[in-house]
Amino acid sequence: MATIEGDIYAFKRKCEALGVKPAVRLNVLSDINYINIIRKFPTVQFYDYTKNIKWAYKQLPSNYHLTFSYSGKVGYKNLIEKVIQETSHNVAVVFRKELPDTFMGRRVIDGDVNDFRFDDDENVIVGLKAKGKAKKDFTSGFVVN
């Protein structure tokens, strides 16, 4: 953890020198709880995607933005649909074809334009177009037709 904190501190200083706000995505291929580190850097914007539904009902630091990941997988689908109905958290959904205007009653925005999820309006679906192997994924529930 000390290395991560050192890297964030160095990045923060570089961003300050450049006059830009630092933004860090710690969980790219994981879903690790970094809340203690995030709290140490209140002037840094942190953001992640997650499938951990418990985070939807927790009080998060104001500098931490989560976008939940949709899946139609049995057992998870009902939970993520509940998040969509009960909270204003954004949910990322991968679509096989063109992005629809709405999904599950929410406006769909084009999430492929950039990865700055913390700049998105609340209560939206972050639409992503299927790429690579996902285009041929017809069984996992990850891609919506």
Question: Residue spans of the language-model regions?
Answer:
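Class I S-adenosyl-L-methionine
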Residues: 1-145
